[in-house]
Amino acid sequence: MKNLVVLLFLLQVHSFCFAQILSDVDEVYPFSEDLAAVKKGNEWGFINKKGALVISYRSDLDLKDNFSEKGKIGNKWHPAFKDDRCLIKKTINEVNYYGYIDSKGNEIIHPQYLNATNFENGFALIIAPSKDVIGFNEILKKDIISSNIEEFVINTLGEKVRYLENPINYDSSKRKSKLPPVFHSKFIGARLVAVQKKDMKWDIYEF
């Protein structure tokens, strides 16, 4: 009887020492800024270093990091926090818009960009849609609108800190591909960005 009590006690201690925190997770990735991405079904969440799910599973977390191998395991992308920001994606009328949440899961920059990068040294690159009135149709009695995309550097509050002077004609409603438009700019230093112009030459800007 005494041996049975000791055995039951040891089993309880063993169970306590190896308590299960999270179960039925499909994918788990390394920590970035004290948070690790976990996937369950088609949704992603984040755990802290104690294994607790601190950002609940959600479907809007994006899966790419355009300019860095960080966040890539093999051929798979996963969401990751950089500078306390993580990309999210929202689809409106079959067009994807990108924004950011913070490490508490709060939406800091609402999805409004046609493409966006992860933050790096406090800044990110984004592609924003713009429309300009370039004339007036006398027959239809309506403005003639030119749809463009423009690239900017933004800070972690979503403020535009540098216009990259490379507008491109673009109409998302007429685009067959669901892939986001491609960047023609890239960070090359802490506050340096290179921009490829239409003649395929590069200009370098400080911001």
What are the roles of these predicted feature ranges?
Residues 1-22:
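Bacterial Sec-dependent N-terminal signal peptides
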Residues 20-207:
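Residue-level detector of conserved, function-critical positions
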